[in-house]
Amino acid sequence: EGNALFLEALGRYLEAWLAELDLALAEKRVALNEAQLAAAKAQEAQGQATFKDVLEAESALAEAKASLFAAQNARALASARLERILGRAVAPKALPLPQDPPSLEEALAALENRPDVALARLRLEEAEAALAQASRDRALPQGSFSLSLAQGGLDLSLSLDLGAGALGYALGYTALGAAEGTSLRAGASLPLFAPVQEANQKVLENRVAQAKLALEAALKDGELDLRQKHQARLLAEAQLAAAETSLKAAEASLETAKKRLQAGTGTRLEVLQAEVGLLQAQRTLEQAKANLLQAHYALMDAMGIDLLGGER
């Protein structure tokens, strides 16, 4: 299905984009831990730190390098997955956020557009049509019409079954004693007791009942799915707003650290720490955007919208 392919490709793209950010954050953390280790060694030489402080800084640096190695592998794996699904290498970037999200009322109004609901309704219509046809066939009388003509030993007869719509004929020849004349016969029958037709009627009635239950279930499940996905989108929007606030705070912290460094009241280490905090806030923001994108398109899919722009 096109929508499933779109959602999978979107997930792989966002995975690769976030892996790029994770790598940049891991590199910055290594730089920070290297600076912290250098500071610890300098403080130890001045008697302001202990050897234990140096060991802890070395351990933190080793962990940061291990995280960097893991981030490099994760980025390579995410890039390979993205290339496999797209068929070519792509450098991921931030995607624009969707505009004009649907309201809950608009989402629920699209319930009939869902493929599962449409399929359940189609099956009900087919079952009802089959039952109606069987009821008509059982109620219609079975009629027949026949015409026979004998002339000079030649016998010709025609018959018409009105119920089946079948026309038959017969041609015969009698050498001796042939009677001449014409006869016309017509008849009709109304089935009062037809066990086979009644059994078939029951089967079709059961199919209609089952189809109605299936449609009701599809409508209930579809409404619940739409409500859940709409709620998930609202939650993603709230998380995005919180991430934007955190980013502003991180930007302010970095600006303060830079001003303190210029004024001689701060250190380069404080600036590095603020830069790491800013990268972390940016990573959190991009994760929130990715969650919003996936929640939005999952809602569009639940509404029965073709994400590739065609017709479902």
Where are these regions (language model features)?
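A glycine-biased, small/acidic residue-tolerant capping/turn segment at secondary-structure junctions
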Residues: E251-V271, D306-G309
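Active/binding-pocket-proximal capping segment
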Residues: Q151, E205-Q210, S246-A257, G277
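Periplasmic alpha-helical coiled-coil/stalk elements that build and connect Gram-negative outer-membrane
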Residues: A4-A118, R123, K229-A232, A236-L240, ...
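Gram-negative outer-membrane assembly/targeting C-terminal domains
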Residues: A295-R312
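A small-residue-enriched
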Residues: L7, R88, A109-A199, L224
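Sec/SRP-type N-terminal targeting helices
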Residues: G2-A4, E27, K52, E56, ...
